[in-house]
Regions:
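C-terminal cap of metal-dependent C-N hydrolases
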Residues: 32, 397, 403, 407-462
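His/Asp/Glu-enriched, well-ordered alpha-helical/loop segment
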Residues: 249, 330-422
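Histidine-rich, glycine-flanked metal-binding segment
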Residues: 38-78
Length: 462
């Protein structure tokens, strides 16, 4: 027989839990023109009602008894921004991969917390962390203990031995062959070296076990790493197909780090649904991306000659400099191919190994280049609705299943209120034409007057 006294205690516990759960009033944002994340024009003056963490309604004459009211004073209300390629654990590590390997977990975590706060103050209410970070900080942000964007985490890098994500120092042999302990970054689950089908399956499943929303695999050579030349094709078709099967079993997707046609096409043949970088792509492969509906996540500022003003890439004695020079020289056709074929581009900042000041300059310049090369509307969609579409590719494994990157009924209430019209001038969201020569600024962007994430206001300077 059930214990009636115990049942009453349990019932009382749940009632008290409901009574003490955080409750905040509805918010009615009035007198605004809305850019909804997809349209090519602003609405006429209207209102948006937020209830809980969702957009409840849009339009004039909304019923909102008891709601907190915000007068937008004719400003533009738009979706919160989405950065589809960040590395929060690497953002404020100075000195590159070697410095990261030498870092303690406290140093890495502290940098990631600072980077998360920085992203939210830059208007990014959602980020896709592309490797090197688990879900601990994500969970603490979701719980309200830390301030930052919602995070879609890929978990640890998955890399082959001597792949782009193999961040071991030259003095550190492979633990498997040497019978020694793993490197610091392996031990901290920043990277996983996986060779062969069994290792690949185990690495994918381990990332999911630790909370990854999707999987990121290094499928080709990189610039910032020292063990792999830029031209190298990484992993075999069998290994990538095994990863694809493991990922699909979780009803989510996987993306790859890949620059050139051979690495991109091998990944697509195996089932990848997103390509990150791709700056060395050819026209035939670009057409394939468009035909198959593949997402393209590309960082643009890195194709500039200004890249060599960065201390890591400008050091002519470094092997990283040699690879960066080859990369910049060979990426000249990329922008023309994107303009011509209009792939499913999402915004990608990929800012690593920087100071706070440089982080802000780089982010502002990345926004500017996206608009300059592709037009403001194309860039803004990549920063909002298209980023939301990519987030939704996580399917039943989506940690935030409501719609992102748009202003419509039922979507998550991630909103920015800005001075100016971003469709005409991206400086409304902080874009700046200078990179290293840009003036230093504070953490927040002055033209972004209000930042709301998940229905809660994190900045209001009205």
């Amino acid at each position: 027989m059930p214990d009636k006294a115990a049942s009453k205690k349990i019932s009382l516990f749940f009632v008290l839990a409901l009574l003490t759960a955080p409750v905040w009033p509805d918010v009615l944002i009035e007198n605004v023109r809305v850019w909804d994340g997809t349209s090519d024009a602003l609405t006429d003056t209207t209102s948006v009602l937020v209830r809980g963490n969702l957009i409840a309604a849009t339009g004039m004459d909304l019923e909102a008894e008891g709601a907190d009211r915000i007068d937008g004073q004719g400003r533009v209300l738009m979706p919160g921004l989405i950065d589809s390629h960040v590395h929060l654990t690497h953002a404020f590590v100075l000195g590159g991969v070697k410095a990261l390997e030498a870092s303690t977990w406290e140093e890495i975590a502290a940098g990631a917390v600072a980077a998360a706060h920085e992203m939210l103050m830059n208007g990014f209410t959602t980020v896709r962390d592309m490797g090197g970070m688990g879900t601990g900080i994500k969970r603490r942000i979701d719980e309200g203990l830390l301030v930052g964007p919602r995070i879609y985490s890929a978990g640890a890098y998955i890399t082959q031995t001597s792949g782009h994500g193999d961040f071991r120092l030259r003095s550190q042999p492979n633990a498997r062959w040497a019978g020694r302990e793993m490197s610091n970054l392996e031990r901290l689950n920043v990277m996983r070296i996986a060779d062969g089908v069994p290792d690949m399956l185990a690495a994918v499943r381990e990332n999911f076990a630790e909370g990854a929303a999707y999987i990121k695999i290094h499928a080709g050579g990189g610039v910032s790493s020292e063990r792999d030349p830029l031209h190298v094709l990484q992993y075999t078709p069998q290994e990538l197909k095994a990863a694809n099967q493991a990922v699909r079993n979780w009803d989510t997707y996987w993306t790859v780090h890949a620059y050139d046609p051979k690495s991109i096409n091998q990944a697509l043949d195996a089932g990848a649904q997103c390509i990150d970088h791709a700056q060395l792509i050819d026209e035939k492969t670009m057409k394939r991306l468009v035909k198959e509906g593949i997402f393209l996540s590309s960082n643009l500022a890195a194709m500039s000659e200004d890249l060599f003003r960065h201390p890591l890439y400008g050091n002519t004695a470094s092997p990283v400099h040699v690879k960066a020079r080859a990369y910049v020289n060979r990426s000249s056709e990329f922008a023309d191919l994107v303009r011509k074929h209009q792939p499913k581009y999402v915004f990608n900042s990929d800012i690593v190994f920087s100071t706070r000041s440089f982080y802000r300059q780089h982010m502002d310049y990345e926004k500017y280049v996206a608009g300059k090369w592709f037009g403001n509307l194309f860039a803004l969609k990549g920063l909002t609705s298209r980023g939301g579409e990519l987030a939704a590719m996580t399917g039943q494994h989506n940690p935030y299943p409501d719609k992102l990157g748009v202003i419509e009924q039922g979507a998550l209430a991630d909103l920015l209120l800005v001075d100016g019209n971003p469709l005409e001038d991206l400086s409304a969201i902080g874009a700046h034409s200078g990179w290293f020569d840009a003036p230093e600024r504070d953490a927040d962007i002055k033209s972004i007057r209000l930042i709301m994430k998940d229905g809660q206001i994190y900045k209001n300077t009205l």
